[in-house]
Amino acid sequence: MHVTEVAADLATEQQVLDDLLTGITDADWATPTSSPRWSVADQVAHLTYFDRTAALAITDPDRFRTMLDDLVGVAGGGDGAVDDLTLGRARKMSPPGVFEAWRANRRLLADAAATLADDSRVIWYGPSMGARSFLTARLMEVWAHGQDIVDALGLDRPASDRLRHVAQLGVITRNWSYVNRRMDVPEDEVRVELAAPSGDGWAWGPEGAPNAVRGSAEDFCLVVTQRRHTDDTDLD
């Protein structure tokens, strides 16, 4: 898949959440979500902040590095200090103000993404990323934080085949999830077989692998983004 296709799917996923937010009330924006201390407005503010830094990572790496240094500088103060930096400006805005800020930063990111080639690399928090993986990570973010919002408000968001991006990211970052938790990475291969929302089948890993995960793509994506426990899904 070309970077332009990933960018188009990202824009579509953002618009799906935009359409849901268009119909909610000011009280809904203040509703707590599953993320500690975060309201619906904070979820959107998080996307707003990091869509902007993502755009700068593409168009102005030096400016991005300054913002990265700022974030590293407050990280020792805990989650509250990070929230103050990344959400503080938005928390002073009205719900319509937060909504419009997100839309504006989405446009910045879309314009920046349009300059990327398939072989481009983008500076980011941690190692640099290939352009397609970089935009896939942004799609995963809007889908996952969108899930927090639809869960909090009881909204309906039908699954789509754009989940393939999220599932792909979940598969390829398996080893990193162990490393990040200071755990030994298992040597055994894993086969992942998922039923797509469209009815197609998606698969990763060798057939006959000693371990396998099977189920719906939506359940798999909910688990790899830590929005559901495996016991609360139909994954095998």
Question: PLM features: residue spans?
Answer:
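An N-terminal domain-cap segment
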Residues: M1-A45, A54
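Structural signal for well-ordered, non-membrane alpha-helices
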Residues: Q14, D18, T22, D51-A55, ...
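Short, helix-capping/interhelical loops that line the mouth of catalytic, cofactor-
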Residues: M1-E5, R52-A110, A114
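Structured surface interface patches that mediate subunit assembly and partner/cofactor docking
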Residues: M1-V6, G23-I24, A30-T31, T59-L71, ...
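Amphipathic alpha-helix face/heptad-repeat signature
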Residues: V6-E13, Q43, V98-A101, N105, ...
